[in-house]
Amino acid sequence: MKKILYDNQMFTFQRFGGVTRYFADLMYNLPAGEFVADIPMRYCENHYVTETYGHKYETISFPKNYRIKRRIYAFVNNHISKFAAKYNDYDIFHPTYFSPYFLKTVKKRQKPFVLTIHDMTFERYPQDVLIYDRTIPHKKRLIAEADHIIAVSENTKRDIVELLGTDPSKISVVHHGYRPIAAASDKLFDRYVLYVGERKGYKNFLPWLSAIRPIFNLDPGLKIVCTGSPFTHAEQKLFARWNISDRLLHISANDAQMASLYRHALCFVFPSHYEGFGIPILEAFHNGCPVCLSNASCFPEVAGDAAMFFNPNDAQSMQDTLKEILASSTLREELRRKGALRSKDFSLERMVEQTCNVYRKL
């Protein structure tokens, strides 16, 4: 039986998020009898570990601010991870983020390590990286040192090879798998387009919103429902200047509400210039939501023929594509049907099995 040692990095940092959902789904679904997962840490408030899979860790009640608590958790958990890398019995090490703290230890112990790369966003958009953030150099170092790399899409693999000159034979593509999160709650809004996640820079939200403004004049009841961070003051001022403040709604949605938002939306729109994979696409497919995507990055690879595509640099293309979806219930039903079929290509079982194939070769 192979023992896989995972570390605490992202489980300490994130309470919710795609990276920790990926690792939790992987660790707790490894085939019994062949692999066993070890994730040594004392403190954890990550939703997928503690709620989805029911593994309880200690927490502290004070301070209330999670950013401050996270520093305490990281201080303790990082010492535990260092000790585990140095002394625990394991066959393969699989870090959850890019701190290189373990490198000397695993090399000295001759333990192979696998690195998952979810995207190359920082490398593609370095202007968005804080000056003191060490992610780019740490990530580059780990990619060079890793025994094998898992990329979550062919697009991400191409980026690693192009940007860092990595040997492509060292990289396996393992697409994300989707695990249904929750049953849908009641319908929350009427007649809306759904936008999920961050809205900054390369996400292309404001250029897309500007492009589709004429549609509001044609469809007086249409709303744009956004999840993710609340609207900033600058965004609110812009919405007011465009006279569309009443068309933009924000919700901090739980899992059941997210399922409902997808299920009742006219369509889900993802205008981003770049993503590593795009988990919301699978969420939309699974919940019967028509999908409207940028034709950039990994989106054609993930969605295939189950989505409508637009040019994210062309305002008319963005507007016309949304108009077409909103105007045709027949088209929306066809996209729902194709999305349901496409979602079967991205099962959790398939993701786990392909990852285990990487482990088996080491």
Where are these regions (language model features)?
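Carbohydrate transferase catalytic cores enriched for Leloir-type hexosyltransferases
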Residues: 1-362
